[in-house]
Amino acid sequence: MYKYIWIFSLTMVFGQYDYSLEDLNSTSEYYQESVGTSYFPNQVTLHYFGHYNWGTCTARFGQLNDLYEYLDSSGYDQVKLIGVGKSQHMNWLGNWTNENNAPVCADQSG
């Protein structure tokens, strides 16, 4: 048991990944702003990493966007969603931005 607590503690200390990417979704309230892990301090943020061109990823991002909008309209504005895909699949970006209002970013790092 102590081994798992130690691993969890190490993850909390050293497992902090930070990124900042431009929001490419024109219907998002953060459009063209650099969003990432540090952009929403003291808020719950879901970071969804997937492929713009895969049907499963597109469907899941749509479901998460629906949940994000439901929570926001219910007064839970402390919950945020950011979708991140690979830049080499930019021609399928519309799969995630059409009918979705959450920020969508493209990871430029290979």
Set out the residue ranges of the language-model regions.
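Short, flexible hinge/linker loops that cap or flank conserved catalytic cores
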Residues: S38-P41, G75
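Conserved redox-active cysteine motifs that mediate thiol-disulfide chemistry
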Residues: P41-D66
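N-terminal "domain-start" segment that seeds a small globular fold
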Residues: T11-S38, A59
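Sec-dependent signal peptide recognition
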Residues: M1-S9
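Serine-centered coil/turn micro-motif
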Residues: S26-E29, W54, S74
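Short, glycine/acidic-enriched loop or turn micro-motifs at the edges of active sites
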Residues: S26, H51, G110
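Conserved segment of the thioredoxin-like fold in thiol-based oxidoreductases
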Residues: A59-G110
